[in-house]
Regions:
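Class I (Rossmann-like) S-adenosyl-L-methionine-dependent methyltransferase catalytic domain
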Residues: 2-74, 80-130, 147-158, 162, ...
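A short acidic, Gly/Pro-enriched loop at the edge of an enzyme's catalytic core
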Residues: 130-138
């Protein structure tokens, strides 16, 4: 039997009259993301793999050097700004989003140190306003695998809406070495996303196959630190092209 309990401190309307109401109700059964991610980014010295690296993802460097030359870029879940700063240094105009004030503050500090201009926004992807079909490239390192299943379809629609025709989408997310391959139903049965959802290759490709041509799909290369780039092999790295 599905045993769902509302998380403490969450006030909801008792009548569902829209999809937003439905999503808000389902959100309430899981952890509150803003508080969770603010706490996560509070200690910049924490022993988290990507906290120890200032440079970009190794796969992103590969994409930029071999396949894509974007002008306008949208980064989802930018964290401390490693990838946004790298892309800005390559001449891109970057909008970078994160729901954590602590993450955005850290990212802005790094950008100032590097003397780089990035448009950082402390916003949820679902609350961010943009001109449709205005980005050449959308990049997500680590957001999607922390999304509740009921948010995944909206996430996909937003990515598609943001991209220009023939635009590119880059994704880094947990494989099953990085997190458990939790079923969508199990997330709600347990009332927890735990440390995130680990995707098999088949499951991840199924999410995107109808809307994107998958150009590259592999495990990230594990890079020993210190290094100017980040890479861990418990993550998938994929580059896709929007099907118009």
């Amino acid at each position: 039997m599905l045993n769902i309990q509302r998380k403490e401190g969450v006030a909801l309307k008792e009548t569902i009259s829209s999809y937003d109401d439905l999503f808000e109700m389902l959100d309430s059964f899981l952890r509150e993301p803003v508080t969770f991610w603010n706490d996560f980014y509070e200690d910049r010295e924490k022993n988290i793999p990507f906290f120890q690296v200032n440079g970009p993802d190794e796969n992103l460097v590969e994409y930029m050097e071999t396949t894509i030359k974007p002008n306008r870029v949208l980064e989802l879940g930018c964290g401390p700004g490693r990838n946004a700063i790298y892309m800005a240094k390559q001449g891109c105009k970057v909008d970078a989003l994160d729901i954590s004030e602590n993450a955005i503050s850290w990212a802005m500090d790094r950008a100032k140190e590097e003397d780089v201009d990035v448009n950082f926004h402390c916003k949820s992807l679902f609350d961010f306003s943009f001109e449709p079909k205005s980005y050449d490239f959308v990049y997500d390192c680590g957001l999607m695998h922390h999304l509740a299943p009921h948010r995944r379809l909206t996430y996909l629609e937003i990515v598609k809406a943001a991209l220009k025709p023939n635009g590119y989408f880059g994704l880094v997310c947990f494989n099953t070495d990085g997190a458990i391959n939790t079923s969508d139903w199990e997330v709600y049965k347990s009332g927890s996303l735990k440390r995130g959802i680990g995707y098999t290759e088949e499951r991840l490709k199924k999410v995107f196959n109808n809307d994107f041509n998958i150009l590259s799909f592999r495990k990230m290369k594990k890079i020993t630190q210190p290094n100017g780039q980040f890479g861990e092999d418990f993550l998938w790295a994929s580059l896709m092209k929007k099907i118009n």
